């Protein structure tokens, strides 16, 4: 059995869970998220906890138990506290600003890059070189952060580009004659 899957999920105050028709819905102060639960995994909701168990003894069922538990735990955390990713812009003239709900990036191209935010994800720019992406869906927040970073990933010689706040860029040495 999966060690991750065995641990029950404690529901914090303000979070409601509903399981019907193979869909698990989590409601909280930051929104509602829904996840389809695989038929090889059984879900039991009681006394403010969610417990997962494999439907049979196959390896696939054991693997899916841990996966489903991790996905639902992220949903519970997302609708109660939310997720955020911080990005920093490193480079002369690199700036970020909000244009309505969209993120406007000046990354050294001849044009500005405008990134539309998907539903449920918000961006903040506390300074011109910092971007904070927030949302209740961990997958969406990470995807948007990866897309923004992908416009100008850190280059290996000077480190200029868009990077995650905790990312260490290993710089290469330039060629010497």
UniProtKB/Swiss-Prot annotation:
UniProt xrefs under Gene3D superfamilies: Ribosomal protein L6, alpha-beta domain
Which GO BP annotation is one of this protein's? cytoplasmic translation
State the protein's name. Large ribosomal subunit protein uL6
* Domain of life assignment: Bacteria
| This protein's UniProt keywords | Ribonucleoprotein, Ribosomal protein, RNA-binding, rRNA-binding
Question: What the protein does?
Answer: This protein binds to the 23S rRNA, and is important in its secondary structure. It is located near the subunit interface in the base of the L7/L12 stalk, and near the tRNA binding site of the peptidyltransferase center.
Q: Which InterPro entries match?
A: Ribosomal_uL6-like, Ribosomal_uL6-like_a/b-dom_sf, Ribosomal_uL6_a/b-dom, Ribosomal_uL6_bac-type, Ribosomal_uL6_CS
Subunit structure and binding partners: Part of the 50S ribosomal subunit.
Q: Name one GO cellular component term.
A: cytosolic large ribosomal subunit
Q: Name one Pfam family in it.
A: Ribosomal_L6
What GO MF annotations does this protein's record show?
Answer: rRNA binding; structural constituent of ribosome
Its family remark reads: Belongs to the universal ribosomal protein uL6 family.
Organism per entry: Ralstonia nicotianae (strain ATCC BAA-1114 / GMI1000)
